[in-house]
Every structure is written in structure tokens, then in C-alpha cells.
């Protein structure tokens, strides 16, 4: 009886190659983070620049801080497009983010302009420590009380690193 080892060896070689390539590319990890803090706003006509500073906790980097600079435009209420960079920093590293097109903040209504919900996606633009090679896009959502300056934020997604 003849045995055909060729196909078996080929399948084994392909399986080993797939494992090696997967390891070389890096791993994917679910990422979650929650932050809260205070926003400082500068309004110039319909242009708004917000500077959030907060504390919280992110998977992979631990307890730490959130900082950023967010640009918005209030000329088309009740929603405003958002853009700008941000940074999450913890004892195990730093993650740099950039808000993507489609990110927005919306007031609850014309009679409640200080009650603002915001959401969108942020692209990872760099990192340090355990997230030095991080890539991916995170979804974020949160609430901002324009009257008090208080905000809370949640980020979720999958990072390749």
C-alpha cells in the first residue's frame, strides 16, 4: 500500500507557517477604558476648543490620565462635528489617539444646550510601553455637562500590538 506523505507534509508546513505569521504580526486584545474629569472651553464665535483633563483606568495601561484638545463648531445646532488629538497615559504606557470624521457632540435640545452627549471613533496614532506598536480604532461615547465642565468617557475596541 502506497502512502502519500506529500499532502500531509504540505498541510503541516502551511499550518506552521500560519502560526509563525500570526505571531509575527502581533496579537489582538480587547481594549476598554473609562475616564472622568473636567473640560476647559474657549469659545470664539461658533468655534469651540475644549481641553479635557481626566483620570480613570484603561485595560493594558492601568490607572492614569486622559488629556486632549478637541475642536468643534456650533454653527449647526444641536450637533457639532469634533476633531483633535488625545492621549491616554498610565504606568504601563501611553496611547495617542486622533478623533475621526463622524465624531460629534449633540446637545439634548435647544432648551438644554449644556447637556451634551458625544460619540465617535478614534484612530490610534502611536503608543509607548506595552502599546508601542499598537494599531486600531476605538469607539468612544460619553457625556459632558457644559454648565459644570464635568465629563465622563468610555472607550472600547480591539487593538493590535
Question: What is the meaning of each model-derived region?
Answer:
Residues 9-20:
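Bacterial N-terminal signal peptides
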Residues 1-10:
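Bacterial N-terminal signal peptides that target proteins for export
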Residues 25-161:
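Beta-strand-enriched cores of mature, soluble protein domains
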Amino acid at each position: 500500500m502506497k502512502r502519500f506523505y506529500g499532502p500531509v507534509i504540505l498541510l503541516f508546513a502551511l499550518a506552521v507557517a500560519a502560526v509563525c505569521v500570526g505571531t509575527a504580526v502581533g496579537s489582538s486584545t480587547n481594549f476598554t477604558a473609562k475616564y472622568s474629569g473636567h473640560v476647559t472651553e474657549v469659545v470664539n464665535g461658533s468655534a469651540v476648543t475644549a481641553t479635557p483633563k481626566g483620570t480613570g483606568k484603561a485595560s493594558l495601561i492601568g490607572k492614569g490620565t486622559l488629556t486632549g484638545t478637541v475642536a468643534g463648531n456650533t454653527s449647526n445646532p444641536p450637533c457639532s462635528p469634533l476633531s483633535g488629538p488625545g492621549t491616554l497615559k498610565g504606568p504601563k504606557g501611553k496611547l495617542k489617539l486622533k478623533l475621526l470624521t463622524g465624531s460629534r457632540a449633540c446637545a439634548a435640545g435647544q432648551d438644554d444646550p449644556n447637556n451634551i452627549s458625544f460619540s465617535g471613533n478614534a484612530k490610534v496614532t502611536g503608543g509607548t510601553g506595552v502599546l508601542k506598536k499598537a494599531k486600531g480604532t476605538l469607539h468612544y461615547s460619553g457625556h459632558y455637562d457644559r454648565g459644570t465642565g464635568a465629563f465622563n468617557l468610555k472607550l472600547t475596541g480591539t487593538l493590535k500590538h
